[in-house]
Amino acid sequence: MSTTRPLLGMKRITEVTCTEPPGGRQSPTASRAQPDSLTVDEFTVHEDKQTELKCSKPKVEQVFQVTFTIIGLLDHTGAHGSKASRQIWLQLKGKKEDVYKAKEYVKGLCDPELQKEEWYPVDMHCIFAGARGLFLDRLLRDTSAEVQVLEPGRLKLSGCAEAVVMAQSRVQQFVALFQEKRSLPADREPSVKRKFKTFVEDRADKYAMELLLLPSALKEELLGLAQSPTQPIVIIDLEQDRSQTSTPVTDLSNRILDTTFEDKTSPITPEVMPGLNGRPCNKRRSSESEQRDTKRQYSLERREEEQCEEREREPTKTWTVKSAKGTLAASEMTNESEAVSPETNLRCLVNFFRTMGYQQDVVERVVRETGQTEDTFLLLERIVEETQKTQSTQGAQRTSRTPDPSPCANASSTSTSNRLKEKERVQMRALAEIKCKENIRPPSTNGIGQKNQTSSVPLASATLKRNNGAQTDLCEVIIIDDEEDFTETERKPRLTPLDLKPESRFDYLPRGSSQTMVPVRMETVTNLRSSSQGPPLRTSDTRPGCSYQTLPGRAPLPRSEAQYTSKAAPLTGMSRFQQSLRTPYRLILQNEPGSPNLRHIIIDGSNVAMAHGLHRVFSCRGIAIAVEAFWRRGHREITVFVPQWRQKKDPNITEQHFLNQLENLRLLSFTPSREVCGHRISSHDDRFLLHLAEKTGGVIVTNDNLRDFVSQSEAWRRIIHERLLQFTFVEDHFMIPDDPLGKHGPHLDEFLLKDSRGSPIIPPLRTDLRATPSVYSQAAQSTAHPSSPSHWPHSGPPDWHLPRPSPSPPPQRSPSETTELKRKLYDIFPDQKQRIDRILSDNPYMRDLNALSGLLLG
């Protein structure tokens, strides 16, 4: 290739044939087909984007499967120019289609033509964050637009105009499919569910369970998005490999056959394993350690193995196991298309759902009704419904049980195997209420079966485990408490002791998760030997062979309320405020004409935002709620004033995008502010409120009394007295009073009309007008009889706090006090000097400036 470059703004494409893709990796397709020709595209961008491109280089190469090289400046003659004017060379190398898409993405990244924000339900966040980011990468690749997850429920789309529109359309399509919850035709739905489940399990993360719960139509759309032309063969190979191994139920049955039905003394040789339909059965069976470390995330194999070991120790079931094994072998010899016999498959299904906490008779009935080939999720739904019906009929019997205070130390071992089986059935029914009410939640990443870590299957909220070391027929019951749903009404039935023997009954101490701040429901089983948390126990009452805590006695609630409250985080106003911010809010203003007779609304943005944020956080959502409230009332002349420095990023300012949205709608104005040597210089935003109210005759929405501006001018004084509208917030509800000027003033609808400006009505002063004759008569009597204490005028406008009546009047004002009051009143009311002199002479005892001002206004 030549080292020369074309002129700025031009590009040159050179096609080169290579034997393998960039990076030295060769896909399965390339190994079987003719290698594709690679394209080299070189173009220029502004130099000031170089840092951003260096950060995006790994992402571009990963998503678009190209080699991205930042060549830099080649023409150093223009090095004296600014970075905004100089340009650097970039090179993309790869397949022609990949290079074209990558170039569109880089161009949109450096010079975005369009930027948009798109909202989606929070429950869809797993699409953009799950599957190890594959869906998000494929969305970037298909649209060539930059898609950023700002927060759960909000995306930022930027890039070329066409790419942004395509990405927005794709996201809106996902949202529509999610909200419609539409299912696929019966012939396609099982196949789509199976493929999607395989796809998600191969890329399992903490969002896997949420992805599996998406609607079928959305699953099909996501599969189409994921099966891009980059790796079509790989996905097919993965699907074929999964289909050749087993389904979750048959895989579980194979594991049970290998671990339980065969003699533990006989080693498992590779020659025996390929017997099941010729399928590769060497997965997870090389050793016991490998089997422990490679458990599937969504199976209950550890607990299933415990149940199998429990059954294996019972001699009465030995011949049943062997006969089942023989039946299985016979079925395999006669029909290679079946992995296990129907009887074994039924037994495995029953055991599988029993480990999830459901009753055996309910599971057997549902499986026989629906058939063994039914989808696992549909079986689970039917089992949950049947369990709830059964529990509703047996609830009265469970709540009527009372514990027996007999100690466990003197328990005898006289119960037989049949009696133990019956007791196990009673225990499962007693725990079924807890188990059947649990919802399917996303699993934690800590794994399954680890006793000191959180369980990843919330449905299995209680596990019955046999004590191997004890000589009696006692069983340990481990109750896993979910503190989130633990209410006062549920404590007694959930902690009712289980009757294990005629003479021994126990109360079991639930140990819940100590991670109370985590929003996801967590359940833990805490080992007594490795944990020191929880209330102290009486060691003399604890069994030596028991690994978990038990408390003897009748009390159904071993832990006190104080211990529960000490674990929970304290409830504060800020915690509730932060919780309310998780609920998405969108500012929606209908594009329809309003009422022309309504006054201009002038909102004190700082006052409203701080009121919504509990006077600790500047909540921009409060401003948006206030604007929407007045918009719904028909106001179209709305102005919000906010200081300009509130545009800066600050942890105490929430949801600043509402400010930009209102500014774009010309409903918000920023008052000027600047910084000089680190000091902020801001104009008083209240002055802007008063100036605009004076110019437009509008109403100021604020809880500030604006007392500092009463003496500025007569017009401002009348605005402060007549046109202030107060408000309050009840969570996210903006409320204003129906009587903004008091109970004797005009109604809110009349107060907000433009016509009321000509003859303003001040309710407190109207009340005073009725009392004015008595006030003046009392003042006249006081001047005629100054020594009479009963005629001293102590009444005035009801909104002012006047001195309390006293047995003797205070002394009259001195001449200096009268002169000072006269000067202040002249400043406030410059056009009423004669009336000021008359009122001062009629009220020689009055020193309250506010009371004198009220008399002047009356």
From Swiss-Prot:
User: Pro residues compositional bias: what residue ranges?
Assistant: 804-813
E.C. designation(s): 3.1.-.-
Q: Which GO terms describe its biological process?
A: innate immune response; negative regulation of cytokine production; negative regulation of proteasomal ubiquitin-dependent protein catabolic process; negative regulation of protein ubiquitination; negative regulation of viral genome replication; regulation of innate immune response
Disulfide bond entries: none
- Skewed-composition ranges (Low complexity): 785-799
Where is this chain primarily localised?
Answer: nucleus
UniProt keywords (A-Z) are: Hydrolase, Immunity, Innate immunity, Nuclease, Nucleus, RNA-binding
What domain of life?
Eukaryota
Purpose of the protein? Potent suppressor of cytokine production that acts as a regulator of innate immune signaling and inflammation. Acts as a key negative regulator of select cytokine and chemokine responses elicited by TRIF-independent Toll-like receptors (TLRs), thereby limiting inflammatory cytokine responses to minor insults. Has ribonuclease activity.
Query: What's this protein's name?
Result: NEDD4-binding protein 1
What gene makes this protein? n4bp1
